[in-house]
Amino acid sequence: MKVKKGGGGAGTGAEPASGAPGPSVEPKPEPQAESESGSESEPEAGPGPRPGPLQRKQRIGPEDVLGLQRITGDYLCSPEENIYKIDFIRFKIRDMDSGTVLFEIKKPPASERLPINRRDLDPNAGRFVRYQFTPAFLRLRQVGATVEFTVGDKPVNNFRMIERHYFRNQLLKSFDFHFGFCIPSSKNTCEHIYDFPPLSEELINEMIRHPYETQSDSFYFVDDRLVMHNKADYSYSGTP
C-alpha cells in the first residue's frame, strides 16, 4: 500500500550510501536491529522526564498532540499501553526521484535476538532513535518511507500516526497518516510518501550547525487513543 502523507514546513533527508543521501542511526538498546546500509553506534540517553498537563491526562487523543508547538519533555504513554502488541520490524527510506534506497534497517527474527535480562531493561528502550544524516538529505524533495510491522491477537481499528518535527522547538512540519484497520496476528507493509518543500539556505545552515536540535515526536493511535509514542533527534552534519 502506498500513501501520501500531508504535512508542511521543512523536510528531513539522509545522506548517500554509494553516492546518494543515506543516514546512520543510533537506536537505543532494545531494537538490536540489523542495518543494511548506514551504521549504528551507542546513543546518548533519551529525553528525561519533564511532566506536563498531557502526562496527567488519562486518555490522550489526536487533537491533544496536534496542538503541541514544541517537542514533548517526556513520553506521553507507557510501553504497557501498547496492548495491541504493534511491533515495527523493518524500515526503508528511498529517494522518490531516483528510486535509490538510502537506508534500510530490520529487526532480526526473535530466534536470533540476544537474551535480555528484563530486570535490567530500560522501560523506554527502543522508543528513542538518534539519526546521523548528511547535508544532502535536507535538499531532497520527496522521500518514500516503507514500514513493516506486526500486530498481536487483537484487531487494530483506525490505526493512525501523527509525526511532528521541530528545530529548536519551532514546528517545522507535521504529518498525519491513517493506516486503517489491521487484522489480528498480521504482518503489514505500507509506504508513506513525504513531500518536502525547499528549505532556505539560512535554515539549512542552522540545522547543520546545530546537530540533534532537530527533534521529532511520533504518536500512534488506535481508535483515537494514544498507544505508542516514539522520539528521535537528528544531525545533518554528516559526522557523529
From Swiss-Prot:
Superkingdom to which the source organism belongs: Eukaryota
Biased composition (Gly residues): 1-12
Location of this chain's protein in the cell: Cytoplasm, Cytoskeleton, Microtubule organizing center, Centrosome; Cytoplasm, Cytoskeleton, Spindle; Cytoplasm, Cytoskeleton, Spindle pole
Notes concerning its domains: Adopts an immunoglobulin-like beta-sandwich fold forming a hydrophobic cavity that captures N-terminally myristoylated target peptides. Phe residues within the hydrophobic beta sandwich are required for myristate binding.
Family: Belongs to the PDE6D/unc-119 family.
Name recorded for this polypeptide: Protein unc-119 homolog A
GO biological process, one term: mitotic cytokinesis
Sites bearing Phosphoserine, chain numbering: S37, S39, S41
Protein keywords: Cytoplasm, Cytoskeleton, Endocytosis, Lipid-binding, Phosphoprotein, Protein transport, Sensory transduction, Transport, Vision
Gene Ontology cellular-component terms listed: centrosome; cytoplasm; intercellular bridge; spindle midzone; spindle pole
GO molecular function per UniProt: lipid binding
